[in-house]
């Protein structure tokens, strides 16, 4: 009996206390807790259903994303130009080596081109040599030079024949005078007189009454004059 009495008394006290707390001892705290719990529940519900939390957040977030997309598109517009330039430069470098329309050149063609170039150079040098005038004083007098037959004009031959008719042997002074008068060298005058004497001897071999001693004396005099 005593235990039941104490239990009923405690139970009645607890009921009085709970009614006191529920009537308004801490009314704001219970409402705040309820509002927070309701906000959390609504937040969880929106997260589970995928609905936007608030209108302001729903407006601000897409605008931020749209700005991000515009920035990304702007950067994409900047970089492809650089990549395109790189591609163009690469194509330019590759075009230097890709020539499908050009014919293949062989070693024989190169040899022919070189030979034709050499022939053109030879022709050019020959034309230049033909255009040059070579005077007698420009010709070399060395022993290795090929000696051609000297041709005399009609006037030169006539004057030399006249001189030979009077003198078959010339002194050096007279030889120099004739060379200046006929525009010939002293050597040419000497050679002409030697050849003319040999011809005269052959023509007048039978009728010539001159002794060989006289010819020898004349030759010695000419050699002395040369010295």
Curated annotation (Swiss-Prot):
Q: Which terms in the GO cellular component ontology are assigned?
A: nucleus
Q: Where is this motif: Antp-type hexapeptide?
A: 134-139
Compartments where found: Nucleus
Q: Report which superkingdom the organism of origin falls in.
A: Eukaryota
What GO molecular-function term can you cite, just one? Answer: RNA polymerase II cis-regulatory region sequence-specific DNA binding
Q: What keywords is this UniProt entry annotated with?
A: Developmental protein, DNA-binding, Homeobox, Nucleus, Transcription, Transcription regulation
For this chain, the family text in UniProt reads: Belongs to the Antp homeobox family.
Matches recorded under Pfam families: Homeodomain (PF00046)
Give me the gene this protein comes from: hoxb7a
Q: Please state what the protein is called.
A: Homeobox protein Hox-B7a
Q: What does this protein do?
A: Sequence-specific transcription factor which is part of a developmental regulatory system that provides cells with specific positional identities on the anterior-posterior axis.
**Main location as per UniProt:** nucleus
Q: Where is this region: Disordered?
A: 201-227
Bias (Acidic residues) occurs at 218-227
Q: From the UniProt annotation, which stretches of this protein bind DNA?
A: 145-204
**Some GO term, biological process aspect, for this entry: which one?**
anterior/posterior pattern specification
Query: Upper taxonomic classification of the species?
Result: Eukaryota, Metazoa, Chordata, Craniata, Vertebrata
Under InterPro entries, the record lists: Antp_homeobox, HD, HD_metazoa, Homeobox_antennapedia, Homeobox_Antennapedia_CS, Homeobox_CS, Homeodomain-like_sf
């Amino acid at each position: 009996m005593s235990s039941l009495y104490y239990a009923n008394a405690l139970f009645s006290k607890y009921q009085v206390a709970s009614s006191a707390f529920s009537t308004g001892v801490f009314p704001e705290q219970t409402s705040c807790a309820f509002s927070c719990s309701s906000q959390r529940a609504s937040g969880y519900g929106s997260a589970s259903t995928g609905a936007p939390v608030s209108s302001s957040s729903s407006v601000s977030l897409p605008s931020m994303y749209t700005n991000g997309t515009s920035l990304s598109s702007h950067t994409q517009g900047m970089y492809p130009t650089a990549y395109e330039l790189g591609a163009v430069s690469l194509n330019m470098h590759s075009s230097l080596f890709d020539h499908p329309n050009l014919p293949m050149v062989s070693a024989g063609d190169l040899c022919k081109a070189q030979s034709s170039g050499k022939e053109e150079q030879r022709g050019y040098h020959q034309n230049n040599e033909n255009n040059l005038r070579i005077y007698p004083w420009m010709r070399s007098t060395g022993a290795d030079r090929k000696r051609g037959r000297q041709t005399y004009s009609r006037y030169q031959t006539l004057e030399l024949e006249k001189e030979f008719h009077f003198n078959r042997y010339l002194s050096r002074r007279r030889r120099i005078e004739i060379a200046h008068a006929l525009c010939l060298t002293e050597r040419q005058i000497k050679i002409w007189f030697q050849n003319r004497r040999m011809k005269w001897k052959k023509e007048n071999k039978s009728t010539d009454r001159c002794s060989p001693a006289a010819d020898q004396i004349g030759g010695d005099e000419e050699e002395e004059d040369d010295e």
